[in-house]
Amino acid sequence: MVGIVIVAHTPVASAMLGFAEHAFGVVPERVRAVDIPPYEDTKASFDRVLRAAYGVNTGQGVLILTDVMGATPANVASKLEALGPLSGLDTPVVVLAGLNLPMLMRCISHRGEGLEELAHKALQGGQNGILRLGSKTPQATSEK
């Protein structure tokens, strides 16, 4: 089973994990949340993400879901992926940015897949979960 770590700005990661607990009735096995508070030293953030990755690792890989590309949570997670075996985590790591609830639900539901397949399904789930609701054509407005 692929481990999943949610890394996001405080309190997004915990809120996402709370939603998963609500949807599944329990906190899903091998899923952890790491909230990154403002002004935390990036070394401290990295250490917490690494500990969470160790906690979910079964040898099948770790998928890290982050909220915003280029922000501290994504940068910290990307460092873990870039270090590879040098991090001490003896498993592949994949980082995805743009976390949303459909992405998380897809990940949890398909954790039996391999890491790369799970990452692909997560991206599909996240993209498919972004929809425009309501009328297909914008309502005409009159400007005066």
Predicted regions and their residues:
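N-terminal loops that bind phosphate or other acidic moieties
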Residues: M1-K144
